[in-house]
Amino acid sequence: MKTAKRRIDVNLEELDRVLDGARQAPLSEEDHDKLKGALHALVAMLARSPNNEKTSAVLGKPEGSSTSGEKQPAANAARKPGHGRNGAEAFEGAKKVPIAHPNLRHGERCPDCGKGNVYGQKEPKVLVRIVGQAPLAATVYSLERLRCGACGQVFTAQEPEGVGPEKYDETAGAMIAQLKYGSGVPFYRLEKLESQLGIPLPAATQWEIVEEAAEVIKPACEELIRQAAQGEVMHNDDTSMRVLQMEREPGDDRTGVFTSGIVSTRDGGRIALYFTGRQHAGENLGEVLKQRAATLPVPIQMCDALSRNVPKLKAGVEILLANCMAHGRRQFVDVAENFPEQCRYVLEMLGEVYGHDAEAREKRMTPDRRLQFHQEHSSPVMTKLHDWLEAQIAERKTEPNSGLGKAIKYLLNHWRPLTLFLRVAGAPLDNNIVERALKRAVLHRKNALFYRTLHGAQVGDLFMSLIHTCQLCGANSFEYLTELQRHARELAASPAEWMPWNYRQTLDRAGVG
């Protein structure tokens, strides 16, 4: 078990006083301890891995436990998906080249024994060969020109079939958008890469290409927002963003800029939306819900407990609010080093609930069956945990203003929305799906640092929404963006037929796929 470190209370004013005093005279023993403790705490926070919050990683194994008593996997247990080499069927985007035998045909006499006939096998021998290539390639066509010596008429060779009139075709815009807004590669970095590969592609040119493409495929994003508004469960959250040139509306005293993420689930599918500006996640969700059909049942909203994530809805419009269990759990993870025994109890109790939810997911339970399952198995656990939390405060076992006390009060204050999954079918446990979606915006912020203008941010939101929705529904985002540009007229006429989950069927009906 990890031992709790000595606690040193310090604030920024004290640190400023210590640093100012160090200019005049050597540090006292007390000031030295404060400064050293603050630096050690900062280093510990920076070094702490945010990717592993499992109870065993946070607190270690409990005393007296041993690996000998742990459940060992069966020798014949099925291996989890994702392990081992990729088979040929995994290369869905690869070019398929069938190769016939040069000398034999199905049903011909065997050249080896001369007695039997050869028949095609069900499974051919498969070879996979992977080659490298530039993200954007170029072809230079040299069209021969002939000039008459008498009349001066010039005759130019015809360009090859399939060469379009535009210098940058639809695939160029799709690839730049995929790299920039899907993979976090800034324009300047792609410019350097292409330059090294002998393909000049200035950052300004890249922006012009994606800006033009965004205008063409805008109807698809607008339809995506409309369909997201009809969702059964809506997750939302936001993260900070930076926009260099952003005009402020008269009377607007907000200084922050945010990228809001919304993930809407509907009929088992998921839609991801991004909105960048001064509005918070709740306000952006409210704008989306304005397009919701009045005949639909009340949706579930999943978010953390911040008030800015809850939309202000007009009279007659309702939502069922659910709060994120992972945020409540993280309150105890953050103070586990100082309160190991109490935090272990809470984390293990919540672990049981997550275990039940994982079992329901593995068994592919319907929302109603999942609700019944949680009521049978998770409700007693949560009731026991609630009684324990109340006893910690009521019986003064925990100081209310301590880190543990604040974590306990967080759960108690938001207990009803935290436990919506025990009362409403389909209510999720946490908001992790939108946290993962926001990583795309965080990746852009980390690599590109900022958007230059709000218009640039809106272009980024459009592409991120389409690309991440493709990822959620298993579609090829590069192919999808390409086809939207190629069929811009059809997209404008009927955008509902050009969603990431149905555009292939639309192409097949048109005889293009």
What are these regions (language model features)?
Residues 1-166, 235-236:
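Short, flexible loop/hinge motifs at secondary-structure junctions
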Residues 46-49, 110, 148, 176, ...:
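Mobile genetic element proteins and their domesticated derivatives, centered on retroelements
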Residues 68, 194-199, 209-312, 318:
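RNase H-like nuclease fold core
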Residues 120-122, 156-159, 243-245, 271, ...:
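Short helix/loop capping segments that flank catalytic or ligand/cofactor-binding pockets
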Residues 172-183:
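Short, amphipathic alpha-helical "recognition" segments used to contact nucleic acids or chromatin
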Residues 184-193:
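Short, charged amphipathic recognition helices of the HTH superfamily
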Residues 233-234, 300, 305, 316-348:
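Conserved beta-strand -> loop -> alpha-helix junction used to position metal-binding or nucleic-acid-contacting
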Residues 303-308, 312, 348-513:
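Acidic/histidine-rich catalytic cores and adjacent linkers
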